[in-house]
């Protein structure tokens, strides 16, 4: 994620705030 297209990745994973 974080700019890399991935359906299995959630935005919160990038920020570390899930």
Swiss-Prot record:
Record's comment describing the protein's domains: The cysteine framework is IV (CC-C-C-C-C).
Keyword Iron-sulfur part of the UniProt annotation: no
UniProt tissue specificity: Expressed by the venom duct.
Main location: secreted
Function: Alpha-conotoxins act on postsynaptic membranes, they bind to the nicotinic acetylcholine receptors (nAChR) and thus inhibit them. This toxin selectively binds to the fetal (alpha-1/beta-1/gamma/delta subunits) mammalian muscle nicotinic acetylcholine receptors (nAChR). It blocks the elicited currents completely and dissociates very slowly from the fetal muscle receptor.
Organism per entry: Conus pergrandis
Keyword check for Secreted: yes
Family: Belongs to the conotoxin A superfamily.
Post-translational modification: Contains 3 disulfide bonds. They are not added, since framework IV presents two different connectivities (I-V, II-III, IV-VI and I-III, II-V, IV-VI).
Chain positions found as 4-hydroxyproline: 5, 11
Name this protein carries in UniProt: Alpha-conotoxin PeIVB
Superkingdom of origin organism: Eukaryota
Gene Ontology CC, one term: extracellular region
GO molecular function, one term: toxin activity
Localization terms from the record: Secreted
Alphabetic keyword roster: Acetylcholine receptor inhibiting toxin, Disulfide bond, Hydroxylation, Ion channel impairing toxin, Neurotoxin, Postsynaptic neurotoxin, Secreted, Toxin
